[in-house]
C-alpha cells in the first residue's frame, strides 16, 4: 500500500495555534529578561571599574580616578555617566588627566538610551592609597534609569567615604534610598 506522507490542514492549524500562543506568552518575558540583563551589565560595568580603581590605588600606593569621559582622553565636567568613563592613575590626585597620568581603562558610551546620573553632581571619584573615596559626599549615589524611566529597572551604585560600594535596586536598602 502506498501511503502519502505529510501534514493535514488540521494538524498544521493546531501547530500554528500552539506556536502563536507560546510566542504571545514568551515574548514579554524575553523582553523583561533582555532589559534586566542590559541594566545589570551597565551597573556592573561601572561597579567593576570602581572596584578596579580602588584596588589599583591600594596596590600602587597612589590615587586612581574614575571620571566621566565621552572622548576617553580627558575628564568631562558633567555627572552623566552614560556618556562613558575612564579609569586612570592620578599621580597628583586632582581628578584630571595630566602629564604622567596613565589611562588604565576606557568605557565607551552606552548604546542604549538609559541615563546614568550621579547625585551631588559627582563626575569623578578618586580613590587614595588607602582605598578611601575622595571628592564625594558620604552616600553618593549614581542612579541608572532605563529609557522608559520605570522603577522596575532603576539601579543605583552607592559609594561611601571609605570606598565601599554596593549595587542597589529601586527602594531603600540598609538606609540608602535608590530612586
PLM region spans:
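N-terminal helix-rich module
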Residues: 2, 21, 25-41, 45-51, ...
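Residues within membrane-spanning alpha-helices of integral membrane proteins
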Residues: 17-18
Amino acid at each position: 500500500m502506498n501511503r502519502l506522507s505529510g501534514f493535514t490542514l488540521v494538524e498544521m492549524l493546531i501547530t500554528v495555534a500552539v506556536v502563536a500562543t507560546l510566542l504571545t506568552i514568551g515574548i514579554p518575558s524575553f523582553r523583561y529578561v533582555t532589559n534586566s540583563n542590559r541594566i545589570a551589565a551597565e551597573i556592573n560595568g561601572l561597579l567593576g571599574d570602581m572596584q578596579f580603581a580602588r584596588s589599583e590605588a591600594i596596590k600602587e600606593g597612589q590615587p586612581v580616578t574614575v571620571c566621566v569621559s565621552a572622548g576617553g582622553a580627558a575628564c568631562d565636567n558633567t555627572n552623566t555617566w552614560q556618556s562613558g568613563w575612564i579609569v586612570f592613575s592620578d599621580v597628583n590626585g586632582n581628578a584630571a588627566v595630566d602629564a604622567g597620568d596613565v589611562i588604565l581603562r576606557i568605557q565607551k558610551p552606552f548604546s542604549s538610551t538609559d541615563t546614568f546620573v550621579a547625585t551631588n553632581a559627582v563626575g569623578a571619584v578618586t580613590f587614595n592609597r588607602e582605598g578611601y573615596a575622595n571628592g564625594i559626599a558620604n552616600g553618593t549615589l549614581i542612579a541608572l534609569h532605563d529609557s522608559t524611566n520605570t522603577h522596575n529597572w532603576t539601579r543605583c551604585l552607592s559609594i561611601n567615604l571609605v570606598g565601599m560600594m554596593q549595587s542597589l535596586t529601586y527602594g531603600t536598602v540598609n538606609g540608602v534610598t535608590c530612586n
